[in-house]
């Protein structure tokens, strides 16, 4: 039997899909989902989304929230501001893993900057004002933006420590790109159906997160570690799939905070 509660150890948002994480003390929710998470996305000349699978160097861009927007910087410290109020009239039809989405180019200047950094023509896009996207879970329709298939990813700190020992390599949680990091016994996250807050909010656990090659990319260098990849795959295999962490969605949540204690509902 699991312990009755767990604490939130860390929270992260990813303002631009596939770029570096931003550590936050609170995770806020509004009518569009997680505030500032995957709010923007890069697309190529064929309007296809850019991901870490094909562009490992995306992990090398860092984001900082400033007055009026997000400052994005490269490894050399050069950067540009993504202004909150910036907008263009250029509509871009794209998709996130087969889900068709109408977007709008955010800023031609920012698109040009990213194009120069990546040495290919790309555009930074955001949801068009009239566009919506929902994750259907039971009777709930949960809004979210450019996340892959589910609004949130929850990972277990102790499972990461065990994995590091198993592959004999110090692994940073940044490799797995969670929104919420909890503290539970190893692999206990797979036995949870929900985490419950005192104010009636819930994190519903949906299914284990199937993993590709991204965890083998060093988040500090952007280098794919070829020797580490098969070790991770071998250790993370469950029921024939390579998984780490749980996809989740938030129901009736207004805010989550680091240090917050949540009650556990077992699956």
What are these regions (language model features)?
Residues 1-267:
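Metal-cofactor-dependent catalytic cores
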């Amino acid at each position: 039997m699991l312990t009755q509660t767990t604490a939130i150890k860390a929270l992260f948002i990813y303002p631009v899909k596939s770029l570096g994480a931003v550590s936050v003390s609170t995770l806020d929710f509004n009518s569009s989902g997680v505030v500032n998470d995957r709010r923007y996305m890069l697309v190529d000349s064929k309007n296809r989304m850019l991901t870490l699978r094909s562009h490992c160097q995306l992990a090398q861009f860092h984001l900082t929230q400033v007055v009026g927007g997000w400052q994005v910087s490269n490894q050399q410290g050069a950067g540009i501001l993504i202004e909150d109020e910036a907008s263009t009239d250029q509509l871009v039809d794209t998709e996130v893993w087969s889900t068709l989405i109408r977007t709008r180019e955010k800023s031609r200047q920012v698109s040009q900057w990213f194009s120069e950094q990546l040495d290919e023509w790309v555009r930074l896009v955001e949801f068009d004002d009239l566009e919506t996207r929902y994750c259907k879970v039971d009777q709930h329709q949960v809004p979210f933006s450019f996340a892959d298939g589910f609004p949130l990813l929850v990972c277990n700190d102790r499972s990461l420590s065990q994995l590091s020992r198993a592959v004999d390599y110090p692994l940073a949680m940044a490799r797995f790109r969670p929104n919420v990091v909890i503290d539970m016994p190893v692999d206990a996250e797979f036995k949870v159906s929900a985490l419950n807050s005192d104010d009636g909010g819930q994190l519903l656990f949906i299914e284990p997160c199937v993993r590709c090659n991204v965890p083998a990319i060093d988040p500090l260098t952007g280098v794919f570690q070829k020797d580490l990849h098969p070790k991770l795959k071998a250790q993370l295999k469950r029921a024939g799939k390579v998984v780490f962490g749980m996809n989740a969605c938030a129901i009736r949540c207004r805010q989550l905070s680091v240090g917050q204690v949540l009650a556990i509902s077992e699956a």
